[in-house]
């Protein structure tokens, strides 16, 4: 380690030949197997392994963490190396990540060492979570495979050294009952859906233009594939700033998270961004995700006039799923599960429900695959959602 293993990362033709031989033997048995290497050798060696069909981990933790914490001097928050094209790779075989079993959690770093200016403080839990949302917007939208670590989608903030680096880490299911963490989860979900549904976010043919190294913390990614263009801008500083979006063309552009449209007549007209704020603009309409995922408002701002039940997540699911309900008053409330034939199979709550937003887990271990109905009833009001259990 350190000074005595520098040879391990140097270009080694024999090692390349051995790994290629082993990969070929594996693929003779099953050609669909993914071979993923935690390798970290010279880039020239990794290119040969990637060209042969193997996937390689790409550690971008330091740079994403610096961006998240708000530190940008000397290009330290430039995470462009997390894109395979920036390394000169011809194939999208770089598995980039900002957290892993060996790297500290972004939320822990935000809460411990986050920057601040005036009333804006990244060490504040709400601000820290919003910073991870911004990281996600500049992570999932870059073409190429990605890796997220356990509970990173919920803002895992236990240190890697708690209780020790190699110890089992606490499994914090209670995060699913935290309103702010659920909004982070759904933000990641919405970003992943972009990758799944629109080739511009995942195709190896996408033209990627990145401006990520500014000491101001202002960052921009431009994506272009055929007639689809996307511009992502974000302010990773702790003060308000403006940025040139450098749109591809004049005309109508759409903001993904709000669904709002904007007519652009000046490609370089500056856009003002609050600290931690970002936008994903596309020249084609995309159905926006759930409202208010990026809002800094408190939970009470989103309470409905009566009761409300959100779509469960995940869905489809196996064997358990989470159901979020909201109420603006204290009323006798029941949350029941019915099968497709209308038979009551489970009751999650039947009690006086205190005003607020709460999340309940339904464990369907003993139930067969199929469509189930979750029905929320309070007084004369009843609302339902469909859920799909697939075993």
Model-derived regions: residue spans:
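Short strand-edge motifs at loop-to-beta-strand transitions and within beta-strands
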Residues: 269, 279, 356-362
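A glycine-anchored, Pro-Gly-centered beta-turn/N-cap motif
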Residues: 251, 356, 368-371
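Glycine-centered coil/turn sites that cap beta-strands in beta-rich domains
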Residues: 298-313, 317-337, 358-364, 377-381
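C-terminal beta-strand-rich structural cap/linker in extracellular carbohydrate-active enzymes
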Residues: 265-293
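Surface-exposed loop/edge segments in extracytoplasmic proteins
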Residues: 260-264, 343-349, 382
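C-terminal tail/sorting-segment detector
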Residues: 347, 351, 361, 365-391
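Beta-strand-rich interaction surfaces with strong enrichment in secreted/lumenal proteins
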Residues: 268-271, 348-352
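Active-site-proximal helices and loops of the catalytic beta/alpha 8
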Residues: 1-103, 137-141, 152-228, 237-252, ...
């Amino acid at each position: 380690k350190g000074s005595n293993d520098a040879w391990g990362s140097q270009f080694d033709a024999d090692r390349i030949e051995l790994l290629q031989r082993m990969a070929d033997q594996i693929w003779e048995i099953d050609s669909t197997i993914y071979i993923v290497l935690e390798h970290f050798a010279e880039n020239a060696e990794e290119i040969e392994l990637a060209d042969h069909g193997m996937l390689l981990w790409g550690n971008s933790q330091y740079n994403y963490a610096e961006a998240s914490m708000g530190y940008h001097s000397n290009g330290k928050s430039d995470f462009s190396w997390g894109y395979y094209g920036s390394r000169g790779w011809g194939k999208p075989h770089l598995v980039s990540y900002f957290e892993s079993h060996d790297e500290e959690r972004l939320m822990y770093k935000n809460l411990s060492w986050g920057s601040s200016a005036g009333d804006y403080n990244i060490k504040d839990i709400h601000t820290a979570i919003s910073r991870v949302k911004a990281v996600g917007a500049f992570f999932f939208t870059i073409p190429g495979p990605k890796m997220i670590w356990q509970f990173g989608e919920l803002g895992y903030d236990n240190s890697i050294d708690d209780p020790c680096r190699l110890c089992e880490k606490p499994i914090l299911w209670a995060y699913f009952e935290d309103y702010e963490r659920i909004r982070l989860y759904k933000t990641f979900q919405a970003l992943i859906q972009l990758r799944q549904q629109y080739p511009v976010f995942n195709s190896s043919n996408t033209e990627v233009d990145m401006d990520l190294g500014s000491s101001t913390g202002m960052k921009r990614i431009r994506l272009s594939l055929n007639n689809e263009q996307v511009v992502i801008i974000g302010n990773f500083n702790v003060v308000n700033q403006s940025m040139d979006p450098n749109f591809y063309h004049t005309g109508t552009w759409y903001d993904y998270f709000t669904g709002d449209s904007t007519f652009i007549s000046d490609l370089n007209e500056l856009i003002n961004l609050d600290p931690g704020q970002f936008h994903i603009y596309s020249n084609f309409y995309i159905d926006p995700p759930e409202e208010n995922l990026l809002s800094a408002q408190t939970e009470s701002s989103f309470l409905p006039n009566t009761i409300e039940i959100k779509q469960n997540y995940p869905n489809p699911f196996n064997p358990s799923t989470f159901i979020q309900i909201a109420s603006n008053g204290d009323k006798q409330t029941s949350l029941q599960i019915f099968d497709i034939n209308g038979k009551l199979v489970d009751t999650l709550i039947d009690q006086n429900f205190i005003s607020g937003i709460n999340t309940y887990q339904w464990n369907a271990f003993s139930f067969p695959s199929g469509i189930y109905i979750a029905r929320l009833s309070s007084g004369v009001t009843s609302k339902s959602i469909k859920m799909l259990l697939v075993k």
